[in-house]
Amino acid sequence: MGQKINPNGFRLGVIRDWESKWYADKGYKETLKEDLQIRKFISEKLKDASVSTVEIERAANRINISIHTAKPGMVIGKGGSEVEALRKQLNALTGKQVHINIVEIKKPDLDAELVADSIARQLEARIAFRRAMRQATQRAMLAGAKGIKVQTSGRLNGADMARREWHTEGRVPLQTLRADIDYAWVNAFTTYGEIGVQVWINRGEILPTRKNKPASKPAKGGNR
């Protein structure tokens, strides 16, 4: 099961949380569609800002959006001008009050979405796919990853027949739920066609915290 299912969804409720946090008794379809529109708008608007994740949280007529990016300065702009303009555009798009929170990604080489996007852009720039995969795995391991697997599929180097190639370093235990596996799939659009880039990064294990139980009091009357 762990080899086939999306690793992010497989760990929801265990070591991962949902990227959309809201409840809709009515109008679920419209709310979900609005979430997709918000994410699409942000990804297109900030396509050069290394945005990895967009979290959406709703409360009454208010939307709280957390943008995880490796380039917070580009998103915020001088004096907060860029993020304020983005907030006004999202207000107009949704018709609701929008609050934006910028979260900086400290180690972009351990973020599967950013790594996959970097490889895809190199493929579009006609960089050799093996070189792009090897450099990505080396940077991830130097950044502290326990393991990484990169797979590219399509007409690699313009070959007549599509195929798959992968590069792996370290351990990537997909069936271990406590293993923090980050996964992403990005498409590269080249002159030879579309090439899929998949990245799995093992960032270590997340162990559940246990609360210490208070010591039991001895029974009255002493030991028997």
From Swiss-Prot:
Stored Pfam families: KH_2, Ribosomal_S3_C
InterPro entries in UniProt: KH_dom (IPR004087), KH_dom-like_a/b (IPR015946), KH_dom_type_2 (IPR004044), KH_sf_prok-type (IPR009019), Ribosomal_S3_C_sf (IPR036419), Ribosomal_uS3_bac-typ (IPR005704), Ribosomal_uS3_C (IPR001351), Ribosomal_uS3_CS (IPR018280)
GO biological process, one term: translation
Annotated keywords: Ribonucleoprotein, Ribosomal protein, RNA-binding, rRNA-binding
Domain named KH type-2: residues: 38-106
One GO MF term attached to the UniProt entry: rRNA binding
Coiled-coil residue spans: none
GO cellular component, one term: cytosolic small ribosomal subunit
PANTHER family associated with the record: 30S/40S RIBOSOMAL PROTEIN S3, SMALL RIBOSOMAL SUBUNIT PROTEIN US3C
Family from the record: Belongs to the universal ribosomal protein uS3 family.
Quaternary structure, from the entry: Part of the 30S ribosomal subunit. Forms a tight complex with proteins S10 and S14.
Protein role: Binds the lower part of the 30S subunit head. Binds mRNA in the 70S ribosome, positioning it for translation.
Name recorded for this polypeptide: Small ribosomal subunit protein uS3
